[in-house]
Regions:
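N-terminal membrane-anchoring alpha-helices
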Residues: 1-19
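Short gly/ser/thr-rich secondary-structure transition/capping motifs
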Residues: 15-23, 87, 141
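A generic structural signal for alpha->beta connector loops
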Residues: 19, 54-56, 77, 103, ...
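Non-catalytic C-terminal accessory region of glycerolipid acyltransferases
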Residues: 91-196
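Structural motif corresponding to alpha-helix initiation and N-cap regions
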Residues: 22-25, 68, 90-93
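Catalytic core of membrane glycerolipid acyltransferases/transacylases, capturing the structured
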Residues: 6, 15, 28-87
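Short amphipathic alpha-helix with an adjacent loop that forms part of the alpha/beta core around
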Residues: 26-29, 97-98
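Short, flexible active-site-adjacent loop segments at beta-strand->alpha-helix junctions, enriched
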Residues: 26, 40-41, 48, 63, ...
């Protein structure tokens, strides 16, 4: 209930402040868990990509973001969970897969950091490994900003068609080459959505 209230208030605020629009909402699965893989340009991205997702998403966020109690409460309301840097890839992957297997959707930014100039980076293979181990579809998402984040600058959030586990054609213990190919497929889809 708190999540729904915050989400609806955020939609209204973003529409007034930025003129936000959404495309491809019909591509979000109605049932089952899934991963949303999105480009990363702004601290607002986790909120933006989840505004049209009916079921709450979870997010990985660096532990430092949870030090401020007010900000911590806000990002936890949107499903963020802390990840300790240096925890090791396997530990982070296990947590993410556990969230998906417990029935929660996962939003992830494969680039691993924000893009300063808006170009979509190469991404990392973690998103591919999580998808492979959890056996869930990946919904590519592109957030396109018109210029910088200033009042009334347009933001468009685009959701692409889900990439199903069958389309991924990957084992649950994939080789590095398989992971790289899958990551490239996901990143190409994201780039296409951003540049459309």
């Amino acid at each position: 209930m708190v999540y729904a209230f915050i989400r609806n208030a955020a939609i209204l605020a973003y529409k007034i402040w930025y003129g936000i629009s959404f495309e491809g909402v019909e591509n979000l699965p109605e049932e089952g868990t899934f991963i949303i893989a999105c480009n990363h340009r702004s601290y607002a991205d986790p909120v933006l990509l989840s505004l049209k997702v009916k079921r709450r998403c979870t997010y990985m966020a660096k532990e430092e973001l949870f030090k401020n109690p007010v900000f911590s409460a806000l990002i936890r309301a949107f499903g963020a969970f802390p990840v300790q840097r240096g925890q090791g890839d396997n530990g982070i992957i296990d947590i993410a897969v556990g969230k998906l297997k417990s029935g929660k959707n996962l939003a992830i930014f494969p680039e691993g950091t924000r893009s300063k100039d808006g170009t979509v980076g190469r991404g990392k293979t973690g998103v591919a490994l999580i998808a492979a181990r959890a056996g869930v579809p990946v919904v590519p998402c592109g957030i396109a900003y018109e210029g910088k984040l200033h009042f009334r600058n347009k933001i468009t959030v685009r959701y692409g068609k889900p990439i199903s586990p069958e389309q991924l054609k990957i084992s649950d213990n994939p080789a590095p080459r398989e992971l790289k190919e899958l990551k490239n497929t996901i990143m190409s889809s994201i780039t296409e959505l951003v540049e459309r």
